[in-house]
Amino acid sequence: MPARILAVDDEPGMLKLLAMIIREKTPHTIETTNNPLEAVQIVRRGGIDLVIADLKMPGLDGSELLEAIRAFSEIPVIIITAYGTEEAAAETREKGVFDFILKPFRKEQIVLGIERALAWSALQRENRALKERLQPPPGV
């Protein structure tokens, strides 16, 4: 079943590139926004399976966006950046990023990151369902 992916970047060219990669190389659908605050609202409405966001954006950067999403959702977030320091990677990992991809990237890196993130998310859902089934019925 195709996933819904949200791409967030303040550069229109990067949004077009991500949309092209996802449409050409995956069965998934993509929604884009250049506004990180709008991205939080889109994710909050539900139906998004994965977020791909730039690290450096005005207003709310990718790390802050990740933190805002983590306040209410555990969907995987992939950060892409041209500013790939160990410090930035460590900070986003502490906040729960799924993957950290450096620009310039190859199309295959994005596709692999997407497929890994969606597979991880499916395993997390399956794990939660199994845990719920293993819970004893009330009163036992």
List PLM regions with ranges.
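Two-component/phosphorelay signaling modules centered on CheY-like receiver
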Residues: 12-31
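Acidic catalytic/metal-coordinating carboxylates
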Residues: 34-38, 61-64
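Conserved phosphotransfer cores of two-component systems
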Residues: 44-46, 68-75, 84, 95
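Active-site beta3 strand of CheY-like receiver
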Residues: 46-52
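Receiver (REC) domain active-site loop signature in two-component systems and cognate sites
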Residues: 57
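C-terminal output helix
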Residues: 87, 105-115
